[in-house]
Amino acid sequence: MTMATVDPERAFFIDETGTTVEMSRDYARSPEGQRVQEDKPRNYGDVITVIGALNLQGLPAVMTIRGGTTKEVFRAYVEKVLVPELKPGDQVVMDNLAAHKDRRARDMIEAAGAKIIFLPPYSPEWNPIELAWSWLKRWLKTAAARTEEGVNNAIAMAMRVIGSEAPRNWIRHCSYAA
């Protein structure tokens, strides 16, 4: 399958991003002559990985985990989070991460009736979820959560407020007719 065969009405764009408890805004304002004060942890702990699927309605299938994405983690995401959202005829579009090519994960997606489309190598510009992750990281910097629970709560809040207009625009921006 090629990118031209992606139907934005049926597509789930999959990817991962990482965050930590030290995310804060890069810039701030303060009254003239005063410095901005902010507490920022030096030891920011483990990376929190966010695995998600973007479609025209938003980010319906999101999971967070401490650490990176392994085959086992991706398999659990597919089984418990992604597959319940899929319908026969849907398309799962993802990059060439080794975990994405796991046979058991692919079998679960195909058993749900969805088709798998792999992006060309080194082409994040074809994956609109990259724009969603950029938006999420700005959200997390504003939230400035300082605990893993705080980060997870901020992510959950972001998923509730994202709406459907932004995902539609991100998908259109990546040259998929939406």
Task: Identify the role of each PLM range.
Residues 1-80, 173:
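Extended, low-complexity cationic-aromatic segments
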Residues 13-14, 92-94, 118-120, 172:
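Short beta-strand segments
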Residues 112-113:
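Short, structured coil segments at secondary-structure junctions
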Residues 7-11, 129-178:
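C-terminal anion-handling pockets and recognition modules
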Residues 20, 69, 92-106, 121-126:
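Acidic, metal-coordinating catalytic cores used for nucleic-acid/nucleotide bond scission
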Residues 14-18, 52, 78, 92-98, ...:
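Short, conserved catalytic/metal-binding motifs centered on acidic residues
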Residues 47, 95-96, 117-141, 149:
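RNase H-like two-metal-ion nuclease catalytic core shared by retroviral integrases
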